[in-house]
Regions:
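Alpha-helical transmembrane segments and their immediate juxtamembrane cytosolic regions
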Residues: 1-369
């Protein structure tokens, strides 16, 4: 979700346009999360807001590719992993933003806690410095990915995939330090890191890629919305948070590394398909917003908490009983457009510029080599 820096080269609008689509889907995923019908496993169930089975299918559909593709695109453009000083600066930037986001998330949960949550929660909301399952995981994961690429710059790619598959056997690899998602999603970032963005863009522009992409997306949509019970067990794998044992215990699926490999294969295929339908042209408003996704991601969860607190989902279900699901889904678009306004990016720019400035001082003093 970081801005693309293309230097003197022509900017590849394909990725900005895709980032706009993906951030809309990220916001959509969090808007509908509480409205998914619980089939089995984690997620869904009684949450105090109206629910619809279509959102259970939509959740699986979205989570199969939206974060993997975001991380792949981030890997494409986060260069400079061979320069330890640059890596340190970028890593610190994401850690600081992640901590700020964790504080914002905690405040939002406390301030906008609904009566249902208050009555049905296991206890008070507490601030977890090292763990938690909030959206801030992405910031800490990005910091870890940059550091890992620096450490593994001379390693073979197969080692990255092997580690991701093996991690599921360790039940201690979970939300603590965001370890599970860091390990599970790193291969997608790493693939972007080792590939060239221009060559990727050139490949997906081929006419047959458009046709194949539409076919792949259509088939996945069919399974998600028409055969929801068949693919819904994959939900716990798609979030990247759960061990194989916990998934097997919560579902009828005998989860192993092959299950993870299957899901990663589905995600990789869908990422390629979504890349294949992207447009490499400058689209008014959309392309600009696609370059500001970091600020949208930082603030959007607070907006979702606020809408739930004030009964937005319940209002839609009552006022538009036949179409409330559609209107709830469309709400993601204005949220993204509003949060793309430049003022929402000012705090993040101040943090990143401050860290870059500090890094330059270290370099001038001869300590950043």
């Amino acid at each position: 979700m970081n801005d693309i820096k293309s230097g003197e080269k022509k900017r590849l609008y394909l990725y900005d346009n895709l980032k706009f689509l993906l951030i809309v889907l990220v916001v959509l995923g969090h808007l509908i999360d509480d409205s998914t019908v619980k089939l089995f496993g984690d997620g869904g169930g009684e949450t105090g807001v109206p629910q619809a089975k279509v959102f259970s299918g939509a959740f699986v559909f979205l989570y199969a590719f939206h974060m993997p593709l975001f991380l792949f695109i981030s890997g494409l453009f986060n260069r400079g992993h061979d320069d330890g000083r640059k890596v340190l600066g970028k890593t610190l930037g994401f850690v600081v933003i992640g901590m700020l986001m964790k504080c914002l998330n905690y405040w939002s949960q406390v301030r906008f806690q609904t009566d249902f949550d208050r009555e049905n929660s296991d206890g008070e909301i507490f601030f977890d410095l090292l763990g938690g399952d909030g959206v801030y995981w992405y910031m800490f994961a990005m910091a870890a990915f940059m550091g890992l690429c620096y450490l593994l710059r001379n390693s073979r790619p197969w080692a990255v995939l092997t580690t991701a598959l093996a991690a599921g056997y360790d039940p201690s690899v979970g939300d603590e330090y965001e370890l599970s998602r860091i390990v599970v999603f790193f291969p997608f970032y790493y693939c972007g890191y080792v590939l060239d963005p221009e060559k990727v863009a050139e490949f997906v522009k081929k006419w047959y890629m458009r046709v194949l992409s539409l076919g792949v997306i259509g088939i996945w949509a069919y399974f998600c919305f028409e055969k929801t019970k068949l693919v819904y067990p994959l939900r716990m794998l798609l979030t990247g948070r759960n061990s194989y044992f916990s998934i097997s215990e919560a579902t009828d699926m005998d989860c192993t590394f092959l299950s993870r490999l299957l899901v990663m294969g589905i995600s990789a295929l869908l990422c390629l398909a979504v890349l294949g339908i992207g447009l490499d042209v400058k689209i008014p408003l959309i392309t600009k917003c696609g370059s500001r996704t970091l600020q949208v991601y930082f603030w959007h969860r607070t907006i979702v908490y606020m809408l739930t607190y004030y009964g937005y989902q319940a209002y839609l279900a009552k006022a538009f009983p036949e179409r409330w699901e559609l209107y709830l889904a469309l709400t993601a678009i204005p949220i993204v457009l509003v949060l793309c306004i430049k003022i929402f990016g000012v705090p993040l720019d101040m943090v990143l510029k401050g860290i870059r400035g500090r890094n330059d001082i270290i370099k001038e003093n001869g300590n950043g080599k």
